[in-house]
Amino acid sequence: RIPHEPVHWDQDVTYDPLADAGKPARVAELIHAFRQRGHLAADTDPLAYRLRRHPDLNFSSYGLSLWDLDRVFPTGGLGGKDRATLREILQMLRDAYSRYVGVEYMHIQDPAQRRWWQERMEGVTPSIDTAERRRILTKLMQAEAFEVFLQTKYVGQKRFSLEGGESLIVLLDRLIDDAAHDGIEEAAIGMAHRGRLNVLTNIAGKSYGQVFDEFDGNYLTNGQGSGDVKYHLGTTGTFTGTDDVTTKVSLAANPSHLETVDGVLEGIVRAKLDRSGSGADGSYNVLPILVHGDAAFAGQGVVYEVLNMSQLPGYHTGGTIHVIVNNQIGFTTGNALGRSTTYPSDLAKGLQVPIFHVNGDAPESVARVA
């Protein structure tokens, strides 16, 4: 497949000095358009049958033609260059904003924050070394092997698998690993039932034996109460990252009411911060992570209620990382019938936060975003 709109033939036999004088301004408009809407052409959907395109990202929409591709224009600092050919400018913009990662940050009102994100998106992408690639592969294999075993051993039992979204394990692994190296003492995770068993074993440290006992019906007999289904349960364990760095990981219990855990997890984290005295000086030792489904994030009011409390002094936790696993369906409801927005994450724009869209079939890009 051709990843972008083909360049069409155009005559270039006339000379218009006024039109040529305005081309640098039109190139600047093109650069701004990619920063603002490049995500609309990014290859972020593993199931896409049609390539995503947008007229604002086609240079011909700005009066530029194929004859301008090798002409030099000012870039305004794009990619660390003051001047570049239109061909080079397009390559840098597509690499930054329209490959496997799409990013939305131009809605942020603070110019300094926008520049910060701009520099990181348009700078040189650090390469992933062999050791990191091996860790990514290991995590993917662990996630897939776990699901395949459960499917084979416990046929017909409910488990709400992570199949198709195994790169979530790569994302959480990289997030918590980096956080542990930066001094975070605990990662607190809240999520619904989809993929919970995989996260319990491959991230939160619950043993495979414990999970298999629950499938076999071997529960502890010395407790009181009726218990709960295995994909509602939480745990507390130890995460081991690169260089043998460790940190505590807690996964909060959650019923089948999807986003119920959101406010509960924020309360848990705030209580931990208050008890430890963290946060008063602007540093936080607990990292909250919430994992959502696409339909639930867009459709359940508790999500926005929790987001709306994020900047209030009485509820602030230093920032929460929200991960949306986009299955492109809400039980039996398709995207077109489940929300009125382009993305399930669109409601988060009101909080001035950057939003990343990444192709789940590109695990290295998932790790880079993390």
Segments and roles (model prediction):
Residues 145, 149-209:
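Active-site pocket-lining segments that scaffold enzyme catalytic pockets across diverse folds
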Residues 2, 31, 89, 108, ...:
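Weak global preference for isoleucine
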Residues 1-168, 184:
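Extended, charge-enriched "interface" segments that sit outside catalytic cores
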Residues 31-35, 93-101, 120-125, 141-144, ...:
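Structural signal for hydrophobic packing residues in well-ordered secondary-structure cores
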Residues 22-29, 42, 84, 88, ...:
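Generic recognition of stable, solvent-exposed alpha-helical segments in well-folded globular domains
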